[in-house]
Swiss-Prot record:
Keywords: DNA-binding, Repeat, Transcription, Transcription regulation. Belongs to the TBP family. The keyword Hydrolase does not apply. This is TATA-box-binding protein. PANTHER family: TATA-BOX BINDING PROTEIN. One of its GO terms (molecular function) is DNA binding. Transmembrane segments: none annotated. General factor that plays a role in the activation of archaeal genes transcribed by RNA polymerase. Binds specifically to the TATA box promoter element which lies close to the position of transcription initiation. GO terms for biological process: DNA-templated transcription initiation. Sequence repeats lie at residues 7-83, 98-173. The keyword Calcium does not apply.
Amino acid sequence: MSSEIKIVNVVVSTKIGDDIDLEYVADVLDNSEYEPEQFPGLVCRLSDPKVALLIFRSGKLNCTGAKSKEDAVIAINKVMEYLREAGLDLIDTPEVKVQNMVATAELGMEPNLDDLSTLERTEYEPEQFPGLVYRMESPKVVLLVFGSGKVVITGLKNKEDAYIALEKIKNTVKELEEEYF
């Protein structure tokens, strides 16, 4: 039985041009904020797809909040088209790279976090945070495992690694249960 993995955030980066005039962009781009004394980039929020784009003077752009790489690319293309219409000279086809994906899933069981905390690469301080932090080496991701069986997986580069990580943590939990009972 395959568990459902839900991608809840995708962060991508790209370069859209060189030496972007952020003051000008802030004037012509709706739903944008540029306050260089607080943050060096311009923040633009879109509602469809619902994302935030961070545009920097260097031409670097980060897109966060997307539910897929495809949604992030759609958002980037929308903003680039608008900026081209406003007179900016931008890269024709920017290379979009996934920096991080966050997924949620269910273990289908309630793990004993005290038992799990005996494993290497784990941190569990229930007085500080209710979840156990497990730093998996392969795939190289971080899992937040909760006593309810809910799991948050961060540091993903693709959805396939989420399935691999979930299967590994499920097997680890089952092995520990057998060992302790």
